[in-house]
Each structure stands twice: as C-alpha cells, then as structure tokens.
C-alpha cells in the first residue's frame, strides 16, 4: 500500500514539474509567437535611443528588471545607464549623481522631463513621438493593459496584506 502512495506522489510531482516547465517555456517564447509585438518593441527601443531618452536604473532594482522585461529581446537596444556600484545601499555611479537621479527606474528626456517607475513601452513611444503603425500601437496597448492589470493586482495584494497585519 505504501509503495502505491509513493508512486502516486512521484507521478503527481512529475506531472506538475512538466506542466510548470511547459508554461515557463511558453512564456519565454511568447515574443517569438507575436512578431508584431517584437517589431513594435524594436522600433520603440530604437525611437528612445534616437530621441535621446535615457533609462537610469540599478542592477538590484526589481522595478528596473520589470521595465527591462517589458521590452523582451529589444532590451539590448535600450539607452540604459547603470546607477549602482554594487547592491542596495551602495553609492551611485558618478553619472547618476551628476544627473541627480533619486529613484529607479527613471526615464529622462531631451525636454528635461522625466518619468519614474515602470512605464509602458507605448507611453514611452508616445513621449518621444515615435511613429508606429496602427497594428503596433494595438499590440503595445494590449501590453500596457496587461501591465496596468498586474500593477492593480499587486496593489490590491499589498493593501490586503497591510489590512491583515493591522
């Protein structure tokens, strides 16, 4: 009887592991399955470079990692400037001190305006007047809507946790 239970447990764990692997693999390949989004992100990243935008962040910053993830494979084109000399609490790099960067991520534009926090690629494209076709705009809008839903979900979870702790 115990051998049967062990076999069932092993089988369940194996199936769960395979399912998890399939889901993660599908998420990583998602951009390849949507070439329109991939091209829109490529164009947006290049527009940011051409428009003189600067993306200040820190290697240890989770919001910076999320910002980069929004650009998928186009992340390598972003005008990224590393501000951290190490982990949290370490001094900023001189370029970020000179730029007076106070939070991460921070996007700075040639008109001396800035946006802080996770910003959708669509909002960044609009900020630098990037010319995108309607299909690209639609794909970036879907991505933005997903980002907003994720942020609202995170805020609701945090609010629920703080209420529970009170």
Tell me the role of every PLM-derived stretch.
Residues 1-33, 166:
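N-terminal targeting signals for export/organelle localization
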Residues 33-79:
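Local sequence-structure signature of Cys/Sec-based thiol-disulfide redox active-site neighborhoods
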Residues 47, 85-95:
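Structural microenvironment flanking redox-active thiols in thiol-disulfide oxidoreductases
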Residues 54-57, 79-82, 106-108, 114:
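Structural recognition of the beta-strand scaffold that forms the well-ordered cores
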Residues 59-64, 84-87, 102-103, 113-115, ...:
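Solvent-exposed loop/turn segments at secondary-structure junctions
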Residues 93-110:
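Structural micro-motif
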Residues 108-151, 156, 160:
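Non-catalytic, surface beta->alpha helical segment in thiol-disulfide oxidoreductase systems
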């Amino acid at each position: 009887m115990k051998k049967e239970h062990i076999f069932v447990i092993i089988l369940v764990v194996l199936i769960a592991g395979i399912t998890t692997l399939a889901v993660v693999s599908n998420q990583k390949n998602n951009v390849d399955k949507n070439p329109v989004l991939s091209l829109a992100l490529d164009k947006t990243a290049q527009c940011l470079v051409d428009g003189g935008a600067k993306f200040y962040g820190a290697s240890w910053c989770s919001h910076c990692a999320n910002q980069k993830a929004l650009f998928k494979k186009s992340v390598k084109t972003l005008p990224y400037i590393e501000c951290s000399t190490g982990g949290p609490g370490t001094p900023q790099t001189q370029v970020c001190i000179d730029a007076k960067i106070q939070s991460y991520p921070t996007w700075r534009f040639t008109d001396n305006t800035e946006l802080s926090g996770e910003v959708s690629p669509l909002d960044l494209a609009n900020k630098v007047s990037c010319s995108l076709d309607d299909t690209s705009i639609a794909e970036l809008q879907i991505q933005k809507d997903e980002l907003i839903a994720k942020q609202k979900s995170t805020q609701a979870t945090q609010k629920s946790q703080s209420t529970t702790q009170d």
